[in-house]
């Protein structure tokens, strides 16, 4: 399973890439607006991210009409070979995905909240579908259940569209996504960091280092 970082913060992206565990990045207008300060422009932020990350970088259109979506998508595609165009799950969005797919432009259908929406996006030719599990949990639904259903549907019909689990709030979302067989999870930086943590890891490391000082008082490894 691939792990994408859901952020437009350059420092977070550099850190994740340096850890060697980030396969791509997803952004949206909200995330980019947080970084568009001190004269930084939208396009400049995206170009910088595309240079840092070798893998896919999702960039969202802001138009809600078919013609505008396609026009913006072509511009986004022109920013770099690894740019993926995020298109909302709407009637115009599906039409835009179909057009862009015919032009071999990778798309990520976003704001998916049920399995049928995911199926429609796949039929239109989306490269990725992004179901929002956290937002479903927020309204009392089991967001992960739709990931399971989408996986089953895509397996049934040998659909190649990748399931990109979004709106992830905690490590359990990541774990369940991996067990179900999602292709990608996109996580905020704080969740990415929490994936590495376990109190027993810290406890074990402290014990090893304490014991090692009995052999090497300064703690150094001498070979």
Swiss-Prot record:
It comes from the Archaea. The keyword Cytoplasm applies. It catalyses: D-sedoheptulose 7-phosphate + D-glyceraldehyde 3-phosphate = D-erythrose 4-phosphate + beta-D-fructose 6-phosphate. It holds the Pfam family TAL_FSA. Its EC number is 2.2.1.2. Keywords: Cytoplasm, Pentose shunt, Schiff base, Transferase. The active site is at 86 (schiff-base intermediate with substrate). GO terms for molecular function: aldehyde-lyase activity; transaldolase activity. Disulfide bonds: none annotated. Pathway: Carbohydrate degradation; pentose phosphate pathway; D-glyceraldehyde 3-phosphate and beta-D-fructose 6-phosphate from D-ribose 5-phosphate and D-xylulose 5-phosphate (non-oxidative stage): step 2/3. It is found in: Cytoplasm. GO terms for cellular component: cytoplasm. One of its GO terms (biological process) is pentose-phosphate shunt. Its main location: cytoplasm. Transaldolase is important for the balance of metabolites in the pentose-phosphate pathway. Belongs to the transaldolase family. Type 3B subfamily. HAMAP family: Transaldolase_3b. NCBIfam families: fsa_talC_mipB (TIGR00875). This is Probable transaldolase. It comes from Thermoplasma acidophilum (strain ATCC 25905 / DSM 1728 / JCM 9062 / NBRC 15155 / AMRC-C165).
């Amino acid at each position: 399973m691939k792990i994408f970082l859901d952020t437009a913060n350059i420092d977070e992206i550099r850190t994740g890439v340096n850890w060697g565990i980030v396969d791509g990045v997803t952004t949206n207008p909200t995330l980019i607006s947080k970084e568009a300060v001190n004269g930084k422009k939208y396009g400049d932020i995206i170009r910088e991210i595309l240079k840092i990350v070798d893998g896919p970088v999702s960039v969202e259109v802001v138009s809600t009409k078919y013609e505008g979506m396609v026009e913006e998508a072509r511009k986004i595609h022109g920013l770099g070979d690894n740019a993926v165009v995020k298109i909302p799950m709407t009637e115009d969005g599906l039409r835009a995905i179909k057009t862009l797919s015919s032009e071999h432009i990778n798309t990520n259908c976003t704001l998916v909240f049920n399995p049928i929406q995911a199926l429609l996006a796949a039929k239109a030719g989306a490269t990725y579908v992004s179901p929002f599990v956290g937002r479903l949990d927020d309204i009392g639904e089991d967001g992960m259940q739709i990931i399971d259903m989408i996986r089953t549907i895509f397996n049934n019909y040998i659909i190649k569209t990748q399931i990109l689990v979004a709106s992830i709030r905690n490590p359990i979302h990541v774990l369940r996504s991996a067990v179900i067989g999602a292709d990608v999870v996109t996580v905020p930086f704080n969740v990415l960091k929490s994936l590495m943590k376990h109190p027993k890891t810290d406890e074990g490391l402290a014990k090893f280092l304490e014991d090692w000082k009995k052999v090497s008082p300064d703690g150094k490894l001498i070979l």
